[in-house]
Amino acid sequence: MNFIIAILLIFISISSSQAVPLSTKSRWIVDEDTGRRVKLACANWEGHVSMLPEGLHKQPLDHIARGFSLMGFNCVRLTYATYMFTHNAHLTVAQNFENNNLTSALKGMTKHNPQLLGLTLADAQKAVIDALGSHGVMVLLDCQVSKPMWCCSNDDGNGFFGDQYFSPQDWLKALSIVAKRYKDTPMVMAMSLRNELRGPLQNQSVWYKYVEKGAKLIHRENPNVLVLISGLDYDIDFTFLKNNPLPLQNLNQKLVYETHRYAFTEGQLDFWTNTSINYMCKNITQEIETKSGFLRSGKDAAPLFITEFGINLSEDDQADSSFVTCLLAWMAQNDLDWAIWAGHGSYYLRDGNQDPEETYGMFDATWKKVRNPDFHTKLQLVLQTLQDPFSRHETYKVMYHPLSGTCGVAHKNQVLAAGGCWKTTQWSYRGEGSPIRLKGTNRCLMAVGDGLPVLLSDDCSGESSSWKLAKNSMYQLANKDENGNHLCLDFDPHVSKMVLTTKCIVAEEDDPDYIKLQRPESQWFLLVDSNAK
């Protein structure tokens, strides 16, 4: 494949097969046999619009499956439509393409994957799952829609139980078929109940009724898989569970909640460019915690899986950049399981258009290359398991710069540099106003002036070695220089490979209208807890 070699070498180390089946222990997904944590770092592969996973007319199946593994993903969220099993069970891949006048896609499939043409759509899905499994990639089967179509809108007839195309009985039938079908396929490690419940028919009592029915049905037919449950309002709202938990007793340690987030969620796109980014990030992460993050704690604690987030990877958009930098920071702090939308680089058919590009896709439109290597690098820390509650290793800090995806490393010249996050430098920090020390040593980070590199020093007693969060910021680590000026850690790869200190870009008040031409994300550094080897 034509992936950039450096990226391949970084990510291939975690592409090995994971142990299945999986289970849960409080907020963590674990190996059912050993009890050790298994972090899911996944890509979405759309298969519901044309009832076949995308891209099989562009590259051989094994090439695509291997590509997901080489990009570092240990699982794929593979979407499907229930009609594929309840209305089109005997339809072959070739017939499906012919019915949709997908002449060009059929020609490409004949070239790259002729072995799939005579298979039913369901058997072709199984072939895709087997190919992923052969490369150590687990599968989450996601029930995206009933009638095959692009998802989602409030009035598409696919949004909630009882909608035009969303028959609860047909839905339960499909869940039963899929659960039974993959009972003996260990790399299918999870099934979702339904993607992004939404629309005018939304009703909490109906949600409880069918979520309980669907979850119990899947677990009865296939007790090996995790069962993913989505909330209301496009899978962002679970607040109603605070006072009325699901009566599932965690489904024998198989219950997982899922949530989604984009820059445009709840009409917030313009806020990412027109509002103070520090203010916006603080309030959005608080909103996520309020609506879904609380599920990770308490007596009914369960894993929270971010099964969709993503940005346009084909252009430099300020709103998307600010959003994803904020979200990655929050995800790293909490070491969440996640799935990027999207893995796929194109579609057979979408909204009446043949072979459109997926600009959010990790693959490009040729399915040969990584679309955006810089964004791929941004994922290097969150691809890793950072926190293992069952680890015996001592906790340390990783210094994470979410804008670039790099980590703060101790350079041989006794300065702080930005480098890779694999086997990165370990730091220790005791909290507000204390030094940031190179773990296991007496050396610490010292600021020496505006625009100058941060030094590693033996003098850890003065203000220039005392670090705390800047006012009204969650992520800007600051101290004072000898003149009493507040300086923040700052990294801009276009300026220097070293981490500098520069004047802090912060508001005097927690003000949503505080906007400057220079944005603060280059100064965002997190000290993330880790106990990984």
Predicted regions and their residues:
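Short Gly/Pro-enriched loop/turn and capping motifs at secondary-structure junctions
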Residues: 310-314, 345-347, 495
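Disulfide-bonded cysteine-rich modules in secreted/extracellular proteins
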Residues: 20-25, 397-401
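Aromatic-rich peripheral "rim/lid" segments of glycoside hydrolase catalytic domains that contact
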Residues: 316-404, 514-520, 524-533
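Lectin-like carbohydrate-binding module/patch detector with strong preference for beta-trefoil
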Residues: 387-533
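Active-site mouth of glycoside hydrolases
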Residues: 24-243
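Cleavable N-terminal signal peptides of Sec/SRP-targeted secreted and luminal proteins
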Residues: 2-19
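Extracellular glycoside hydrolase catalytic/binding regions
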Residues: 162-165, 169-190, 194-336, 356-363
